[in-house]
């Protein structure tokens, strides 16, 4: 009964966050940081009756202005993630993250993670140096496709963009429409031909719910049927076919979406 998390919590080490754990019998030593401690996390998952978890971190939101230091931060975090993933690989997978503001470094880090045995990586589209339809990303799509390492994308916004104010409904409106902000990324990947050129490229759109997905796919198909093809990015299939072959969408508590799919 009840939940083991508190949506009003303001941090993983705050008393407000830790109280729900302790109330449900999870043993937490003083100073424990549950998301960063795999043993505590597994205990939490057992209490919640969750078998496995794919975990997104927030590396992209860390404000590091020096590029070389930033790259070191990403490498250190990703090395840590791969260590965590050895503890119980059937149940915990902490996604290594790519520094998408720096495409060349992004490619290097993807290559390093593939060599380290990563099953998937996080690709945040909100902080990219160039839009995902730009040619600068072609080497990344090719590498991920060849290695068959999925790129995982989470809903959100630009790291340096603050939430709208909690005033006159602005923040609630932003949060209410957050699941839809991956629709543009999906459409750009389809229409730039990334999936056409790289048939084994897999992209997972995470925690975005799925109620919008059938409409978005149908509307993308209609563009192909009603508009002149773009000669710079020819497609041999409908967007709905690329969606089925190359994409996945995860959700929670989406009754409408489950009925439509």
Regions of interest found by a model, annotated:
Residues 1-261:
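Helix-coil boundary/capping segments in enzymes
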């Amino acid at each position: 009964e009840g939940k083991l998390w508190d949506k009003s919590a303001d941090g993983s080490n705050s008393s407000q966050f830790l109280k729900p754990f302790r109330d449900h019998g999870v043993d937490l030593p003083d100073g424990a940081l549950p998301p960063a401690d795999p043993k505590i996390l597994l205990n939490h998952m057992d209490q919640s009756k969750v078998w496995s978890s794919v975990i997104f971190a927030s590396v992209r939101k860390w404000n590091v202005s020096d590029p070389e230091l930033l790259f070191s931060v990403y490498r250190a975090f990703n090395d840590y993630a791969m260590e965590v993933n050895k503890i119980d690989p059937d149940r915990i997978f902490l996604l290594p993250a790519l520094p998408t503001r720096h495409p060349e470094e992004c490619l290097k880090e993807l290559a390093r993670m593939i060599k380290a045995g990563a099953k998937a990586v996080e690709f945040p589209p909100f902080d990219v140096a160039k839009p995902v339809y730009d040619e600068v990303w072609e080497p990344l799509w090719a590498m991920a496709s060849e290695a068959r390492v999925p790129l995982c994308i989470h809903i959100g916004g630009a790291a340096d963009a603050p939430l709208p104010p909690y005033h006159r409904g602005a923040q609630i409106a932003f949060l209410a429409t957050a699941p839809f902000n991956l629709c543009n990324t999906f459409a750009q990947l389809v229409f730039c031909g990334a999936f056409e050129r790289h048939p084994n490229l897999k992209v997972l759109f995470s925690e975005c719910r799925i109620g919008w997905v059938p409409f978005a796919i149908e509307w993308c198909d209609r563009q192909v049927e009603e508009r002149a093809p773009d000669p710079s990015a020819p497609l041999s299939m409908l967007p709905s076919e690329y969606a089925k072959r190359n994409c996945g969408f995860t959700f929670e508590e989406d009754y409408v979406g489950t009925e439509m799919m």
